[in-house]
Amino acid sequence: MSNVTHQPKIGFVSLGCPKNLVDSERILTELRTEGYDVVPRYDDADMVIVNTCGFIDSAVQESLEAIGEALNENGKVIVTGCLGAKEDQIREVHPKVLEITGPYSYEQVLQHVHHYVPKPKHNPFLSLVPEQGVKLTPRHYAYLKISEGCNHRCTFCIIPSMRGDLVSRPIGDVLSEAKRLVDAGVKEILVISQDTSAYGVDVKHRTGFHNGEPVKTSMVSLCEQLSKLGVWTRLHYVYPYPHVDDVIPLMAEGKILPYLDIPLQHASPRILKLMKRPGSVDRQLARIKQWREICPELTLRSTFIVGFPGETEEDFQMLLDFLKEARLDRVGCFKYSPVEGAGANELPDQVPEEVKEERWNRFMQLQQQISAERLQEKVGREILVIVDEVDEEGAIGRSMADAPEIDGAVYLNGETNVKPGDIVRVKVENADEYDLWGSRV
């Protein structure tokens, strides 16, 4: 055990998705509450925590490199996060890591920190920790994680093996956290999980309580409650269950943002079956049409995989045909890559890398054209924009159709009389395939 007499300092690196970021925020909040200082430099710290990602091979490599960098610069390293579920893989490369825990193992991480860098006797920082906790996002938006794990067994994914089955947070806890965020100045709440639509399934949608009132543990009830907070509410990772239809009217009424992030993954029924994903493309197209009739302002974001094992040119053409008909607003596309432990690794007819690359290019070319056409329709219109950054040249923000980091931006050239978090009305003057340009009205 170390004998720490100074204010103990912890270095921290957070990798991966927003769900991992929320885990990091929770650990950092606890450390700050206990009196630890969090520092940006490894060589200044008494030890380093690396919160890893292990979803795809490139993420594993990035995590292993971050661990190595921390070991080289500091020497005392605790590893947590998704890759931590594969301890042998980490120890094979970095045997000198002090401790390894899996994802959302907050208590274990803190116990290990206490062992190697004991808690300070006095805690001058306690009163400085904000009620909403330590946040790694800008002050005006925050991620709200509503559950852990996932009950699906998609063949390309290993998340359930790392994060387990679905565990929904009590709805009272979720709503109380949301209220604290809004009280602290947050203007946009981004609801995240592995499967937001499944919220409450594991507890049979039991009734919880918030402010003494009964509230059902479900995505729809959660959206209804969040809409009362008077801030932007954005839904991510929404699996296309039937009850998703019930949140569209809330969007049409302006209660939550008209934005749905639905990872569809493919459009060939045969490939979707191999992926163990729902496979009725015609039904999905009909629902998209119905959603847009109810809520014309709806923005649809999705992600797809090309080059999945067994994908033929015919399967890929079905995907392109789906894109042409669905005309989604925001789309991400990944070339399939094997992930250790994923069922898809055992499938026959692996697609050659050059074919994956060629299909990815065709996919992106088509979607960029669709996206450019969708954004061009906004030129001349007035939209609301939340400001993210301001400098001497102007401001950069996002419309209701744009989530941070993954979607486009709205550029307000010369607009310096605003601050981050302001929501302003903008007339759109120009557009390309991803971004908009405009002036404040």
Swiss-Prot record:
State a single Gene Ontology molecular function.
protein methylthiotransferase activity
GO biological process terms, alphabetically, are: tRNA modification
Cofactor note from UniProt? Binds 2 [4Fe-4S] clusters. One cluster is coordinated with 3 cysteines and an exchangeable S-adenosyl-L-methionine.
Binding-site residues, [4Fe-4S] cluster 1: 17, 53, 82
Q: What is its main location?
A: cytoplasm
Which cofactors are reported in the record for this sequence?
Answer: [4Fe-4S] cluster
Can you give the residue ranges of the TRAM domain? 376-441
**UniProt binding sites for [4Fe-4S] cluster 2:** 150, 154, 157
Q: Where in the cell is it found?
A: Cytoplasm
EC number(s) of the enzyme?
A: 2.8.4.4
Q: What family, per the record?
A: Belongs to the methylthiotransferase family. RimO subfamily.
The name on file for this protein is Ribosomal protein uS12 methylthiotransferase RimO
Identify the species of origin: Salmonella gallinarum (strain 287/91 / NCTC 13346)
The primary gene name is: rimO
